[in-house]
Design a protein with these regions (language model features):
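Beta-strand/loop-rich accessory regions of lumenal/periplasmic or secreted enzymes
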Residues: 1-256
């Protein structure tokens, strides 16, 4: 999708229903943990329908993944606003860590910004959970290799892997808005009401972002009973869904 002739969205929507994974508590001193960030697989379209409703264009797509079947509808207007409503039925049992829709932006959209409902009233300025902020895909001035016996002189939030800095790729829960922007001030913004969640990362030569309707903590075995009320295991035949609202254009959000 282009805004004033400039690409802002180049892919999606794709369904993500990332399974909750865990295991025994074993020592592992290898920092090269494999990335687990998969979309649903084997998408096949069964039908498409395009229509106009007033000044809006609506496109409904029916299809199936290996893991889910269902549909989504895109409603697009001339102001650069997109609403994507989706509903999918599970084709197999899954205990999800996160589920929602994933979109893709050009690599130049390498800063993320957000406003969200925080759990606490005060956060350190460089904390990944701060309620209002902006984060870079990668921060400058960091060494490529780090010695385990040397104390870092920078915040942990600036550490990075191939997906980006910790600050850029962390999940922001309960957003009012969150988005990406490039150096020219062009933005892609997810607008919510404090109940959806945002995560962005580098995917090869593009930036991807997830707008999630469900997130839960990781599979930490010692806290399994505490986290149990926050899990939502899905049985075959159960459905997930939601509506993602995106605004494409120049930045008009303020961070107070």
């Amino acid at each position: 999708m282009k805004k004033d002739g400039k690409e802002c969205l180049v892919g999606g929507p794709w369904l993500m229903a990332l399974p909750l994974t865990g295991g025994g508590c074993y020592p592992n001193h290898n920092a090269n943990t494999p990335i687990f960030n998969d979309l649903c697989t084997e998408w096949t379209v069964s039908s498409t329908e395009a229509r106009t409703e007033g000044e809006d264009v609506c496109i409904t797509v029916q299809g199936s993944y290996k893991e889910f079947k269902g549909n989504y509808t895109l409603r697009i207007n001339a102001s650069g606003e997109i609403a994507v409503s989706y509903t999918f039925e599970a084709l197999q049992d899954v205990n999800p860590r996160q589920w929602g829709l994933v979109f893709e932006a050009p690599a130049s959209f390498d800063r993320t910004f957000w406003r969200r409902d925080g759990l606490w009233t005060v956060y350190p300025e460089d904390h990944i959970s701060r309620p209002v902020g902006e984060a870079a895909l990668f921060y400058t001035g960091l060494p490529e290799t780090i010695h385990p016996r040397v104390k870092p002189s920078w915040a942990w939030s600036r550490d990075f892997n191939e997906l980006g800095s910790n600050d850029f790729r962390s999940t922001r829960r309960n957003i009012w808005y969150a988005g990406l922007k490039n150096e020219d001030g062009n933005t892609v913004t997810a607008v919510s009401e404090g109940h959806q969640h945002w995560r962005s990362w580098l995917q090869q030569d593009r930036i991807r972002f997830l707008v999630a309707d469900f997130v839960t903590p990781g599979d930490e075995m010692f806290l399994s009973s505490y986290y149990a009320p926050y899990r939502k295991p899905l049985k075959t035949g159960e459905s997930i869904g939601g509506t993602v609202k995106l605004v494409v254009g120049e930045s008009n959000t303020t961070q107070e």
